[in-house]
C-alpha cells in the first residue's frame, strides 16, 4: 500500500523514482507553495494554490481520492487530478518563465513582472518562454490552450508577488537548482519530438 509522491518542481524526476521502486508505487503531484526560510523555525508563506495528485496513466483511482481527502482533512488542500501530467505541465509553464529569470536577475515576482520599469519587456519575454514550452507540451501529447498556459503564469505572479523563486534562492545560497527538471526537461523533450 506504500506510495511515493514527489512534489519537486519540474518534470522527469518521477521516472527516476519509478526506476527504483516501480511504476505502480509512484503517483504524480504538483503544488504551489511560495515560501522561504527566514531562520530556524521561521518560514514566511507568500501564498499558495491547491495541490494536485493523480495517476500517471490518468483517471482518478480510490487511492488518489483517499490521499487527497486525507491531506484536505488536515488543512492541506489537495485535489484528485484526472490528468496529472497536464497539471504538472501547467505549473511548468510558469516555472520556465519565472524561475530562471528570477534567478538570473535576483528579483522577486513583483520586481520582475509588476513594478519593473521594463515590465512590458519582462512580461513579453515570459510569454514567449511559455509559448515555446507549450509547443513542446503539445508535441508530448498534452492538450493545453495558450490561455491555460498564460492563466497559470499570471495566477502565480499575481497571487505571490512578494515571493522570490526557489531557483533564485538556490543560486543565492549556492545550492544545486532544479533547472534540469524545468528548462532542461523542456529542452530534452523538445529534442525528442523534433521541436526547435
Which residues fall in each region the model found?
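NAD(P)-dependent Rossmann-like dehydrogenase/reductase catalytic/cofactor-binding core
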Residues: 73, 125-196
